[in-house]
Design a protein with these regions (language model features):
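Compositionally biased, intrinsically disordered low-complexity segments
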Residues: 1, 46, 97, 101-104, ...
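TOPRIM metal-binding catalytic domain and adjacent DNA-binding surface shared by DnaG-type primases
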Residues: 1-73, 123-128, 231-234
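Intrinsically disordered, low-complexity, compositionally biased regions/tails
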Residues: 18, 44-45, 50, 59-60, ...
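TOPRIM fold recognition
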Residues: 68, 85, 129-132, 138-234
Length: 234
């Protein structure tokens, strides 16, 4: 009888030193300012603390990916307008990754490999019995957590972030997926069934954004009446 083949070992991946993340947490940035003016100080500070929202030396937001073992995988650096909460356009636009910056500066060892995790994954173990809301982007997760805090909000970073590997931490959980309007919704509708079956989680794909979005490619964050929220917090 043939011996069973050994299970393939997971590919090794690199981590970012935790102190590197921690030094960004005390820095302010336009995105944090927008959170405070929109949702009020208490909610904003909860979001900033829960999601480890950092700031770069240049004033950009850093959205850290911290896994369920509290390891820092990487961070996404993005510039936001503090008045509108929207990403800067044109010459002011900036998007980068912490691991890419460190690699360019020679601060990572040779052979360092990235393995992304769910944004907000570290929150799952803190709230093991609550429904998980899965969004595409970090900002949508923040807005969702501010307005619907009874669910644990995480994000997959992009439309194509729906993979068995990325969603493995959802095993045994009940989940609601909020895809962005348009192609994202159709992509998730096609892919989620087999992934949920393989990983072992229950899910509902919400069509709220698909039914109510005005702009193509819209998400929950695009649909919120921020002016009304600001007036309530003034």
């Amino acid at each position: 009888m043939d011996k069973p083949k050994p299970k393939p070992q997971p590919e090794p991946y690199g981590l970012i030193p935790r102190w590197f993340m921690e030094q960004t947490l005390g820095r302010d940035c336009g995105y944090k300012q927008w959170l405070r003016t929109t949702f009020g100080g208490d909610i904003a500070e909860r979001l900033i603390a829960d999601y480890y929202i950092g700031g770069s030396a240049e004033g950009d937001a850093v959205f850290w990916q911290v896994d369920s073992a509290d390891n820092v995988r990487t961070g996404k650096i993005m510039s936001y307008d503090p008045a509108t909460g929207k990403r800067h356009k044109g010459e002011e636009a900036y998007t980068d990754w912490v691991h890419s910056v460190m690699r360019r500066e020679g601060a990572l060892p040779e052979g360092w490999q990235l393995k992304q995790c769910l944004y907000g994954e570290h929150l799952l173990k803190r709230r093991p019995n609550e429904i998980v809301a899965v969004a595409e982007g970090a900002k949508t997760a923040h807005v969702g957590s501010a307005l619907m805090p009874d669910m644990v909000w995480v994000a997959v970073d992009s439309m194509l972030g729906i993979t068995s590997e990325r969603l493995e931490p959802l095993k045994g959980r009940k989940c609601i997926f909020f895809a962005d309007e348009g192609r994202g919704y159709e992509e998730w509708k096609e892919r989620l069934g087999p992934i949920a079956h393989g990983v072992g989680f229950q899910y509902l794909l919400s069509d709220f954004v698909e039914e109510h979005a005005v702009l193509s490619g819209g998400d929950i964050a695009d649909m919120i009446g921020y002016e009304e929220l600001r007036e309530r917090n003034e």
